């Protein structure tokens, strides 16, 4: 699963770095990114891992208010980030304050705040929680 997420992020960044706009399909449907995201907030630790693997550093992470929840080797690779609360209950105020241009959320865990997140920035909904490695 993590390999697929890394592949997806790498492909997404490759496509939008060479084009003016890119249409992205996720678990909720499709949306268009007008430019390459520079200020990304992730609401799952696996998404932070995947971004770090392709040298993309999120500005905000739902790290459960504990930086040690992120794997040490990933934490060493990331610049200081702003905690945006817990994965189960991310802080919409903290996310909005960071002025992200993309939020990456879990399609199951964050379904209840999806509309509120969309008011802040485009939201990429991916599967992370309750997934197996085969998926």
Predicted regions and their residues:
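Short coil/turn segments
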Residues: 62-65, 106-109, 128-133
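Stable alpha-helical elements in mature extracytoplasmic
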Residues: 47-50, 91, 109-113, 135
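Short, flexible loop segments at the rims of nucleotide/cofactor-binding pockets, characterized by
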Residues: 20, 36-38, 79-85, 101-103
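Bacterial Sec-exported substrate-binding components of ABC uptake systems
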Residues: 2-46
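Structural recognition of the beta-strand scaffold that forms the well-ordered cores
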Residues: 41-42, 58-62, 103-106, 124-125
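A short, structured surface patch at a secondary-structure boundary
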Residues: 45-94
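Extracytoplasmic substrate-binding proteins
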Residues: 30, 112-135
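Proline-aspartate-enriched helix->loop->beta-strand connector
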Residues: 92-94, 99-104, 122
């Amino acid at each position: 699963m993590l390999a697929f997420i890394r592949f997806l992020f790498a492909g997404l960044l490759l496509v939008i770095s060479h084009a003016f706009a890119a249409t992205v399909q996720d678990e909720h449907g499709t949306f268009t990114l007008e430019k390459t995201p520079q200020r990304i907030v992730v609401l799952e630790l696996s998404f932070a891992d995947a971004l770090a693997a392709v040298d993309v550093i999120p500005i905000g992470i739902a790290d459960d208010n504990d930086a040690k929840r992120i794997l040490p080797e990933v934490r060493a690779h990331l610049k200081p980030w702003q905690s945006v609360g817990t994965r189960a209950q991310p802080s919409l105020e903290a996310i909005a304050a960071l002025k992200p241009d993309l939020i990456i959320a879990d399609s199951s865990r964050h379904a209840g705040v999806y509309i509120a997140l969309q008011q802040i920035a485009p939201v990429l909904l991916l599967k992370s929680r309750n997934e197996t490695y085969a998926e």
